[in-house]
Amino acid sequence: MRATEIRKNYQHLWKGGTLLLGMLMICSAAEQLWVTVYYGVPVWKEATTTLFCASDAKAYDTEVHNVWATHACVPTDPNPQEVKLENVTENFNMWKNNMVEQMHEDIISLWDQSLKPCVKLTPLCVTLNCTDLRNATNTTSSSWETMEKGEIKNCSFNITTSIRDKVQKEYALFYNLDVVPIDNASYRLISCNTSVITQACPKVSFEPIPIHYCAPAGFAILKCNDKKFNGTGPCTNVSTVQCTHGIRPVVSTQLLLNGSLAEEEIVIRSENFTNNAKTIIVQLNESVVINCTRPNNNTRKSINIGPGRALYTTGEIIGDIRQAHCNLSKTQWENTLEQIAIKLKEQFGNNKTIIFNPSSGGDPEIVTHSFNCGGEFFYCNSTQLFTWNDTRKLNNTGRNITLPCRIKQIINMWQEVGKAMYAPPIRGQIRCSSNITGLLLTRDGGKDTNGTEIFRPGGGDMRDNWRSELYKYKVVKIEPLGVAPTKAKRRVVQREKRAVGLGALFLGFLGAAGSTMGAASITLTVQARQLLSGIVQQQNNLLRAIEAQQHLLQLTVWGIKQLQARVLAVERYLRDQQLLGIWGCSGKLICTTTVPWNTSWSNKSLNEIWDNMTWMKWEREIDNYTHIIYSLIEQSQNQQEKNEQELLALDKWASLWNWFDITKWLWYIKIFIMIVGGLIGLRIVFVVLSIVNRVRQGYSPLSFQTHLPAQRGPDRPDGIEEEGGERDRDRSGPLVDGFLAIIWVDLRSLCLFSYHRLRDLLLIVTRIVELLGRRGWGVLKYWWNLLQYWIQELKNSAVSLLNATAIAVAEGTDRVIEILQRAFRAVLHIPVRIRQGLERALL
């Protein structure tokens, strides 16, 4: 009876259970994400690559060949673009910057290349008979104008002429720094025993010309614009440029000349301030002008030292022989040292006493301030500049500081050991004006300094000179390929391409680096276009540079770098395009895939990824899994191509025109023969079956062409209902003539036979399915009713248990309350009982 009641009320329980099951399935189902490829994302990685140069075509004299070979550089961009990267923080390290090493190697190569065609002075390594030049002292001049005795030597020597077996005597003037005494009157050139001396070609100019280092296509240069950036650590004001500012390759020691200035206060930079072996680079905020001159009016003469070789030396000095010197403002310099001392105190402690002392010794290039002025190499005594403390100031009492300078013509190449250069003398007087924009300092070591820090001028490693200008730059490699999870899955359908919004074109290269991934996705076309346009522009620049120097029939260092940059850019672009092609994403900025996103790569939600993260942060998070994702995309694309190939193999039936291809006629003939053979065999089988059937009925076959009675069904016997009645008229099958007629009859019989058998089979299957369905539905209803019955029983049992528990609890509660009431009444009656007892006692 109860089971019947449950069966009647199962409908609303069924609906409720279905709804609950659906809600559970929706809540438990995790949304599937798929890998999507993006091309042109604003992502970069630190890299080292070959940089090429750009220079202003009007910055040098076309009549002379500057040693920097800037004629081989591409022209500078008249409108350079610098794009500020919002919300981007990047780490810089000026002490581990490959741009510095690359510039250093370039300068070495340029000097070597400029000296290759020049004359080797090996024949000049002979004994020199030298005497001091007359009028080498001038008592009427001031102390700094008086040239020291023996500063210029008049030397005679025997030299081979254009005829090798003929020797003649020649004389020349040499500076004292360029000769070494052998005995009292005999000398030799200073570097003959250690180096190969090469004379600089007559028309080579050492005048520094600004060089812009540029990144090839596919790379970018990041620039730190923090005004107080110390060279290492994070920088929050970052922009991207294609080329650096113009850097003058000034070769100098102690003082940095004609560089860039700090925008606000003086900035001091060092790799490690606590290590006194590390150089301190000081960048000034105001330049100090230094004017240098060689007052001597020199003449230059040529000495033939062999076939096709000439030595250029100083012939004579017209007028008084005076000391070369440099002048700078004492007030400006003292103010500069005071500001530097303040910054050094901030770094090393305000309780420290800052002292500047001259160099402690070493090579002339280190002890003095060495630089090139108008083609001559000056070595100026900087003692007056670096004799300073808070109380003593400078010893010089005049308005200007005058530095006495000496000149050398044989220069030890600061780049390499075993090479020296002879700088030919310059005619006439020499004057040059430079701006002091920085200093190179070293700190004295020792533990017991008594609260004093002593700083001395340093230098010698030209990398520090380049580092003082390149500290704000770093080269990065653009990684335009990015992968991220989305809800979209690749479908093998064809859709029209949509045009990218024009608004993206107004954003600069990498301009969306600080934006979220969702916002940056609309600027993909900018990066994609500039990668290719940069390569094309690089190609045009290269061809222009080669055309400009084609008369030389050789490439300079810069020309080789142009080729390297071009090849590198093409290789990177082709590699990216190859990956896109392998993934089936050619020509697409956003490409969906069939690779499911694995939460082990990143378990962040879509909102966290696309609304809160930049592409740079996202790339750092999945960087370890990038190769795995790439391989999975490639495998997925390979599988898809195999599937498409199998599908296309079936597509040959789509075109009826292919059926008439002459190459398939033999196949058609083969099929026709098989069909005819099958029909003939089928005809034979039917004839045999007909004969067997007739024989079983008692007839004998007379002829295959005889009319045979048609078979009747079981519901139509041969006679009438009464016995002995007349037979019904027999039906006979038609006798046909001709091969095609026989084929038609056989095909018709075969089709009818197949139709009847298939119909019977279908009816049987339908009956079976119907029977199974009924029984299955009955079983399901039975189990459902049974489940509802037991659920109701469990519910009733639970209700009964709850009721019994409630009754037991209620009864127990009543008993407890009754006991408490009795106890309370007993307590209340105690005074009454006491009173009654007292009354009884009194009575």
Curated annotation (Swiss-Prot):
Coiled-coil ranges (or none): 620-654
Lipid-carrying residues in chain (S-palmitoyl cysteine): C751
Residue window of motif Di-leucine internalization motif: 842-843
Annotated region (V3), positions in chain: 292-325
Name of this chain's protein: Envelope glycoprotein gp160
Motif YXXL motif location, chain numbering: 699-702
Keywords: AIDS, Apoptosis, Clathrin-mediated endocytosis of virus by host, Cleavage on pair of basic residues, Coiled coil, Disulfide bond, Fusion of virus membrane with host endosomal membrane, Fusion of virus membrane with host membrane, Glycoprotein, Host cell membrane, Host endosome, Host membrane, Host-virus interaction, Lipoprotein, Membrane, Palmitate, Signal, Transmembrane, Transmembrane helix, Viral attachment to host cell, Viral envelope protein, Viral immunoevasion, Viral penetration into host cytoplasm, Virion, Virus endocytosis by host, Virus entry into host cell
Organism, scientific name: Human immunodeficiency virus type 1 group M subtype B (isolate YU-2) (HIV-1)
